Regions:
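Active-site-proximal polar cores
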Residues: 65-66, 79
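Winged-helix/helix-turn-helix nucleic-acid-interaction surface
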Residues: 11
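Functional cores of ribonucleases/endoribonucleases
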Residues: 73-154
């Protein structure tokens, strides 16, 4: 059309470009927020932690879980049932240190790599869907939807 500086196709392409830039900015700001929180987070060896940032940093720094985590087998020995509340048999403890199979292949695979998992933000009652999954070679991922999606932390 003469006299028009923009065609509908040009406007569509510009809208797509703007949307892509916004997604990129949002992803970047999310990553920047995570990095800023990691920089502010401090952990001490031997202390108990249950939050995402603190437990991830503890694993990253000390290459082990904080001492307030026990495996499912250890919890069962104390009388815990998988659908029951851990706090009744092990006050102050969280489940962690058990093998994670990565059967769906959502996490990066590499020869010799193995994964373990731990609960995040457990206080009392039944376990929630939040987990950290960490590898024997330093990778740490977070899921808040019981392994359907992951966010890389380290």
């Amino acid at each position: 059309v003469l006299g028009c500086s923009k065609t509908p196709q040009t406007e569509l392409n510009q809208a797509k470009q703007q949307a892509a830039e916004q997604v990129s900015k949002t992803a970047k700001s999310g990553l920047e927020q995570l990095q800023e929180k990691q920089a502010r987070t401090k952990v001490e060896e031997g202390r108990a932690y249950t939050g995402k940032a603190e437990v991830a940093l503890y694993i990253h720094t000390f290459h082990k879980l904080p001492g307030n985590f026990i495996t499912k087998r250890e919890a069962e020995r104390l009388g815990w049932k998988h659908k029951g509340t851990l706090n009744e048999v092990a006050p102050g403890k969280s489940i962690g240190g058990d093998r994670y199979g990565n059967y769906e292949g959502l996490l990066p695979q590499k020869s010799g790599r193995s994964w373990k998992e731990c609960d995040i933000d457990y206080k009392t009652g039944n376990r929630n869907a939040k987990r950290l999954v960490y590898s024997n070679d330093g990778l740490i991922y977070y899921t808040d939807d019981h392994y359907k999606s992951f966010e890389k932390l380290y």
